[in-house]
A protein has these predicted regions:
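Viral virion structural and adsorption modules
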Residues: 1-33, 268-273, 278, 302-316, ...
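N-terminal secretory targeting modules
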Residues: 1-2, 6-225, 231
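Conserved acidic residues
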Residues: 155, 279-281, 314, 373, ...
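Structural alpha-beta junctions
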Residues: 243-250, 306-315, 353-358
């Protein structure tokens, strides 16, 4: 029988096989194994890579520019790849200037190969300098010319994204922080300098591609949507969960984003392009929806879930709202447990609806339809697939952060002092919860 072959860095390699004979290792001879036939995936055009991001936060590249080198695991067999970058200016947080972008790609250890944009070496992401006049039309979606393969499931693609602005500041290009476990890091310099860089700064906010596209036979490709709590931490809990489960995903985190924004005119701006290449959504929103009250939050969620279903989303996964009340050392308090306690009670009850409208928590009306729920103790309570979240579910990711179930009160060790934001330790705890939720649901 011929020896087995393993796929490494784009090549099939026949490993040496030895046997222990008389206390010595002896190589076993044999004929080389033929490389298995390459069969590209047959399926819809999807994002097939991990570690993607929509770009809408400020980058400060300096006068010469700055590049970020990121790593992305591929989850499809592909003859070629099409990379894309989605620019969504957020002028309220400094992302105001038009930003020049160049990019390169390689296999680990290889040479950087330049990517082109309709044959050109660079392209531009549109900025905008006024939050008051920003409209959903102020967006940029750029796609590189195809990058040739072939590529196998499990291969790693390294991408270097270089950005610059005329002033060296206020550019558009950051989504998520550089992660040493997944990325190479950042380096400043001209295009000629960054492609020969030997060392990178593996910290701070980084620029990354938004999609790696190819036909895919994967069960799901995910769009992740969040607010500042998806931007601020070194590793958001969504990144932890989806990276750990080896799922293709695109993270879109925007300071101040609410479910109400998606229910209004900003659906296409924030999610529309991703949903051309993703069939599933995970939402960590709700922090910025509290001002709408319980009924308003329910209406926003139901509107967004209906939009998702109309857009062809197979599953919407909704996380419960993070705590909103804190008891300080010495007895002081901040925030308010409501409407967090009430909206989470409704979500934990499967977000019951009757004829498309929110039903009371705990209703026993036989016409009520509930979503699948994953409880605080990892019990899966099956719901009705006709519920607006479709094949998705509601995941209780809040219990691990609050002092007791339904208290909406931050555990002291996770309180970031403003009741809205939370950082690395809390995200790590939630990330473990999300990993288990995804596993329980077959992902």
């Amino acid at each position: 029988m011929p020896p087995a072959a393993i796929h490494r860095d784009g090549d099939w390699i026949v490993p040496a096989i030895a046997m222990l004979r008389g206390g010595e290792w002896t190589t076993v001879s044999g004929s080389p194994a033929p490389a298995p036939e390459f069969v590209p995936d047959d399926g819809p055009l999807r994002n097939i890579a991990s570690n993607m991001g929509v770009l809408q936060n400020q980058v400060t590249p300096g006068m010469e520019g700055e590049a970020t080198a990121t790593r992305h695991t591929l989850y499809a067999n592909a003859t070629s790849l099409t990379l894309g970058w989605f620019g969504r200016p957020n002028p309220g947080f400094g992302a105001s200037q038009d930003t020049t972008l160049r990019a390169w790609a390689r296999r680990p250890g290889g040479a950087w190969a330049p990517l082109t944009f309709a044959g050109a070496a660079e392209t531009v992401l549109q900025g905008w300098d006024s939050a008051a006049t920003l409209t959903p039309e102020h967006r940029t979606d750029v796609y590189a010319d195809p990058f040739p393969g072939p590529f196998q499931v499990g291969d790693v693609l390294e991408v270097m994204t270089w950005v610059s602005t005329t002033t060296g500041a206020n550019g558009l290009g950051v989504q998520g922080r550089v992660d040493q476990a997944y990325d190479l890091g950042r380096v400043q310099g001209t295009p000629a300098e960054v492609v020969s860089a030997a060392q990178f700064d593996a910290s701070g906010p980084g620029t990354r591609p938004s999609v790696v596209l190819a036909p895919s036979a994967q069960a799901a490709s995910w769009a992740l949507i969040g607010d500042s709590n998806s931007v601020n931490p070194d590793r958001s809990y969504m990144s932890i969960g989806f990276r750990s489960r080896n799922l293709p995903h695109i993270l879109n985190g925007k300071h101040g984003l609410s479910t109400g924004d998606l229910a209004g005119d900003w659906w296409d701006f924030q999610l529309g392009e991703q949903l051309n290449y993703c069939d599933s959504v995970y939402s960590a929103l709700l922090t910025n929806d509290g001002g709408a009250g319980l009924a308003g939050m329910q209406d926003r969620l139901l509107t967004v879930w209906a939009k998702a279903k109309a857009a062809g989303v197979t599953r919407w996964v909704q996380a419960t709202k993070t705590p909103s009340y804190a008891v300080k050392e010495g007895g002081g308090t901040s925030g308010d447990p409501e409407p967090t306690t009430s909206i989470n009670a409704w979500l934990r009850d499967g977000a019951p609806v009757i004829d498309g409208a929110a039903a009371p928590t705990g209703t026993t009306d036989p016409d009520a339809v509930r979503a699948t729920v994953i409880t605080w103790d990892f019990q899966v309570i099956p719901g009705d697939p006709s519920h607006p979240v479709g094949d998705g579910w509601i995941g209780d990711t809040t219990y691990v952060l609050e002092t007791s179930l339904g208290s909406s009160t931050w555990k002291p060790e996770y309180d970031a002092n403003d009741v809205n934001h939370y950082y690395n330790a809390a995200h790590a705890a939630q990330g473990e919860v999300l990993k288990e939720h995804l596993r329980l649901m077959g992902f």
